A protein has these predicted regions:
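An alpha-helical, amphipathic repeat domain used for nucleic-acid recognition
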Residues: 1-257
Length: 257
């Protein structure tokens, strides 16, 4: 599935990133132990381009290759041969390595299907990336237009009501399950159903369900239809109105109650 892009640009900018980060369990850095055996008084001895990828640099400290980072990160961090390898520098390089790995993982996920910011943060966290890096990458990709919570949410909303009717609350709940922020989920649900006659939509659905139960008594069929509508989030008044319309046109092939 291709990534959903909106020509107007990203709409959410990962507004759910803050709350999502708070819900993540722990801070599992993929590179936590990568510098454990490097003496703090060692210096950078080489920074070499990779033959397989000229945009990447291999960083050596002492006799050990310590990390492979992007050339842009080398410049941004001011890495140079002879620079002292300090704990602070090690942490910065570790963060750059993990950020690069997380970005690659995120792009791989987005190549398969679209995600909301919250979903992507959760997936990166489950793969072991720290919450801080996961949020940072999601925000970066949202700014670039590769994640768009509003476009993604609208696509889900259209798909949800394409074959079965749904109430506004049901639709908003489905969007929240896909980690769409609550205020955006409510707005999308409201706008999706703005021109929909919910009683008429529910009645058409009920008639299809009734036709699919030719050997079931009318009483049992009505009970099942009412339960199905309740599961789709319809309130008691809408269900009653739907069943009233249904009973106005009884089917002759239904068994007697």
């Amino acid at each position: 599935m291709t990534v959903i892009l909106d020509p107007r640009g990203p709409r959410s900018a990962c507004r759910a990133a803050g709350p999502a980060a708070a819900k993540l369990k722990g801070d599992h850095s993929t590179g936590q132990q990568m510098f454990a055996n490097i003496a703090p008084d060692t210096t950078i001895t080489a920074i070499e381009p990779l033959r397989s990828d000229p945009t990447m640099r291999r960083v050596r400290v002492g006799r050990k290759t310590i990390a492979t980072v992007q050339a842009a990160d080398v410049e941004a961090m001011g890495l140079a041969v002879g620079l002292d390898w300090t704990d602070q520098l090690a942490q910065r390089v570790q963060r750059a390595v993990e950020t690069h790995q997380a970005r690659g993982a995120a792009l791989g996920l987005l190549n398969r299907r679209a995600y909301s910011c919250g979903e992507l943060i959760d997936r990166l966290a489950r793969r072991g990336h720290s919450s801080q890096v996961a949020v940072s990458i999601a925000q970066e990709l949202a700014t670039a237009g590769l994640i768009d919570d509003e476009a993604y949410g609208r696509a889900i909303a259209r798909e949800t009501v394409a074959t079965k009717p749904a109430s506004q609350e049901f639709l908003a709940r489905k969007l929240r399950e896909r980690r769409i922020p609550d205020d955006l989920a409510q707005r999308i649900a409201c706008e999706t159903l703005a021109d929909v006659d919910l009683v008429e939509a529910a009645t058409q659905y009920a008639r299809k369900r009734l036709h699919a139960m030719p050997t079931v008594s009318r009483t049992t069929a009505t009970r099942r239809i009412a339960a199905a509508l309740a599961r789709r989030g319809f309130d008691a008044d809408t269900i009653a109105a739907t069943l009233g319309r249904l009973n106005q046109a009884p089917l002759t092939d239904q068994p007697a109650t």
